[in-house]
Design a protein with these regions (language model features):
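An N-terminal hydrophobic leader/cap segment in hydrolases
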Residues: 12-59
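Membrane-embedded segments
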Residues: 64-139, 143
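Short alpha-helix in the alpha/beta-hydrolase fold that links the catalytic acid
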Residues: 95-96, 206, 215, 229-238
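Gly/Ala-rich beta-loop-alpha elbow adjacent to hydrolase catalytic centers
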Residues: 152-156, 160
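Active-site nucleophile loop of the alpha/beta-hydrolase fold
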Residues: 175-185, 202-206
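Active-site nucleophile elbow and catalytic-triad environment of alpha/beta-hydrolase enzymes
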Residues: 195-209, 214-215
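Short beta-strand/loop motif that positions the catalytic acidic residue
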Residues: 212-214, 218-225
C-alpha cells in the first residue's frame, strides 16, 4: 500500500514538473507572440489612410518605407519622432501628428513604423526594432541640425529611451507615455510564477538606458493601466537622474 502511495505521489510530482517545464518552454518559444501584436496592411491602403490624415510616406535612401511624416512650411520647425506601442501600426497614432500640428507651423512629425507592422517588411524583435529606430534617427540627423524630440508610447518608451542613451547630445527631449522600467519587470508582474528574468530575450531596459541621458523628459502615467503597471512608470520617473 505504501509502495502504491509512493508511486502515485511520484507520478503527481513528475506530472507537475512536466507541466511546469512545458509552460516555461511555451513562454520562452512564444514570447514574441505575447509581446508584439502587429496589424499588417497593404501599402496602397495605408497610403490612402495617411493622405486622409495629412501624412506622407517616409522612406529611406533605398525607397523602403520606414514610417509616415508631415512637414510644416517653416524651415525653423522642430522635429519629433514618435514610437508607438506594441499593437496595431503607426497610423493608428496619427493623433500625435494632429496634436503637434495644432500648435501651428512649429513641428515636423515623424511616425516611425516597426518592422513587421503596417506595410513595413521584416519581423518585430528588440534587436531589429532598435536597429531600425537608430537608422531612422540617423537619417533625420543627416538632413540638418534642427532639434529632434522623441515620443515613446508604452513599448515605444523603451525604444525612445534606448535612442536617447545612444544619442544623448542629439536628442533634445522626450515625452514617455505609460512607460515602464523594463519589459522584464512588466512580464514579471503578469507571469509571477515564471523565472522571467532567465527566459525573456526582449528586455527594453528603459531604466538602464535613461541613466545615460540627462536631457528633459516628461512622463505621462496612466492611473489604471492593465498592461503596464503604473508603479513601474512611477519608479522610472522617480529614478530619472536628469
Amino acid at each position: 500500500m505504501q509502495n502504491g502511495l509512493r508511486r502515485r505521489v511520484a507520478g503527481q510530482i513528475t506530472l507537475s514538473a512536466l507541466v511546469v517545464v512545458g509552460v516555461i518552454y511555451m513562454f520562452a518559444s512564444l514570447q514574441r507572440q505575447l509581446i508584439y501584436f502587429p496589424q499588417v496592411e497593404p501599402e496602397d491602403k495605408l497610403l490612402r489612410v495617411a493622405a486622409a490624415a495629412g501624412l506622407q510616406p517616409w522612406r529611406d535612401s533605398s525607397d523602403a518605407l520606414i514610417g509616415w511624416h508631415t512637414e510644416s512650411a517653416n524651415d525653423q520647425s522642430k522635429r519629433v519622432l514618435v514610437f508607438h506601442g506594441n499593437a496595431g501600426y503607426a497610423l493608428h497614432r496619427d493623433y500625435y501628428a494632429a496634436g503637434f500640428l495644432a500648435q501651428g507651423q512649429y513641428w515636423d512629425v515623424y511616425l516611425f513604423e516597426y518592422p513587421g507592422y503596417g506595410a513595413r517588411t521584416g519581423a518585430p524583435s528588440e534587436v531589429d526594432i532598435k536597429a531600425a529606430a537608430r537608422h531612422a534617427l540617423e537619417l533625420l540627423l543627416s538632413h540638418d541640425a534642427r532639434p529632434v524630440y522623441l515620443v515613446g508610447e508604452s513599448l515605444g518608451s523603451g525604444v525612445a529611451s534606448y535612442l536617447a542613451s545612444q544619442f544623448p547630445e542629439q536628442v533634445a527631449g522626450m515625452l514617455l507615455v505609460t512607460p515602464f522600467t523594463s519589459l522584464t519587470d512588466v512580464a514579471s508582474h503578469h507571469y509571477r510564477f515564471l523565472p522571467v528574468g532567465a527566459l525573456l530575450s526582449e528586455r527594453y531596459d528603459a531604466q538602464e538606458a535613461l541613466s545615460h541621458y540627462r536631457g528633459p523628459v516628461a512622463f505621462l502615467l496612466a492611473g489604471s493601466d492593465e498592461i503596464v503597471p503604473t508603479p513601474l512608470g512611477q519608479t522610472l520617473y522617480e529614478g530619472y537622474p536628469g
